[in-house]
Amino acid sequence: MQQDKTFLGTEPVGQLLRRLAIPTVIAQLVNMLYNIVDRIYIGHIPEVGSLALTGVGVCLPIILIVSAFACFTASGGAPRASIYMGRDDMDSAEKTLGGCFTLQIGISIVLTAVLLLWGREALLAFGASENTIDYAADYLHIYAFGTLFVELTLGMNAFITAQGFAKVGMYTVLIGAAANIVLDPIFIFALGMGVRGAALATVLSQGLSCAWVLVFLCGKKAFLRLRRENLFVSPKLILPCVALGLATFTMQASESVISVCFNASLLKYGGDIAVGAMTILTSVMQFAMLPLQGIGQGAQPITSYNFGAKNTGRVRETFRLLLKVCLIYSVSLWLLIELFPGLFARIFTPDAELIAFTARVLRIYCAGLFLFGIQIACQMTFVSIGSAVCSIIVAVLRKFVLLLPLIYLLPALLPDRTTAVYLAEPVADVIAVTCTAILFATQFRKALHKLEANA
């Protein structure tokens, strides 16, 4: 086992990043399809497609919250487990895995109960109109029953990737996505279930992915295994995981809060078509964010392991390469969106009016996308080295300090209030990336100097 896991500290960084990031990026790209394939099919339901798409879009904030809770323990626990592996403390690494697993189950039970009891009320508060509430409620009610699958799949898959098994993590997503793509048209169109069919397809697909994850983590191929004796929550091990995971949780949960604010403002100033366009914009933004996060997740085991092993040279080298790759991707996608916005809109709907509206605002909404490579590289590296405070600062700054106030401030200052709501995103992005880069330049250097002094 010792010989197997040390490849994170010995193989060339460029080769390692390709080995770990490519499967993770593929998984994120497929996961992106997993997340948006429902919307593509729903948007093409005869006669009611546009309203149904808008209704499912209102569910997005709640779905983001469910996903965020999966990150609450795992996004902190997985890097901590990698750091323990770098220190050759496999016992603490496995206890971290077991404690996070148990905590994830408890969170799932609570979330399922909340969604079933108060889901409809939440949808109305989150921007559903009388025209879209029935579609939203139908989708969410069925989706709620798959909460356990979502939590364990997203949460525990992070521990698979953290051990360096990027391909296994990729298969987790491929299995679910393939099942979802096959089941969606059957349930939505062939069986005439509409949005309920889309939700059922998602739940069943997540169940398959969950089974795959648990079989691997209980098997002999994993370095870190789920063992009965480790399924207890040790505050000493879990609290640092939760503190570190709080940054990722804040980032994802804030997406939900921001989505609610966007939907409410857009419904007020632009009506259902503006909310429908926002559903498409959010999906397009996933084309940017998920692959970037995949690259960052591929780099995470390398950074965390070598940080734990006090190999600062490889930590620096990994960050430089991560930043370069992330920037190339974000700039390339930004150019495509700015040049061909209508192409992205047509993927989701055949409605000519919605396509025209979306194409116009997409250029505005994604204007700051080219800078995302810097944001993600710095953010993911903070998490990888266990810098909980800096991670939380970066997460809170962009969404709560900048974007949230701008959603309400800009419409009060500009004549075209609907456009002003969309403009809040790029303005916040530019300011946030600037602040993040400055913070990272000082804190990353300080963390490595401290590590070298204690070596």
Predicted regions and their residues:
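N-terminal transmembrane alpha-helices
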Residues: 8-48, 61-76, 80, 84, ...
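Small-residue-rich hydrophobic transmembrane alpha-helices
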Residues: 53-113, 150-169, 277-335, 339-341, ...
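Short alpha-helical transmembrane segments in multi-pass integral membrane proteins
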Residues: 1-24, 81-148, 190-245, 303-368, ...
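Helix-terminus/linker motif at the lipid-water interface of multi-pass membrane proteins
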Residues: 29, 33-53, 123-130, 186-193, ...
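Interfacial/gating helices of multi-pass transporter permease domains
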Residues: 42-64, 131-135, 195-196, 237-244, ...
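Transmembrane helical elements of multi-pass membrane transporters/channels
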Residues: 19-38, 142, 176, 205-209, ...
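Short runs within selected transmembrane alpha-helices of multi-pass transporters and secretion channels
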Residues: 74, 143-161, 169-177, 198-213, ...
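Alpha-helical transmembrane segments of multipass membrane proteins
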Residues: 36-40, 113, 121, 155-159, ...
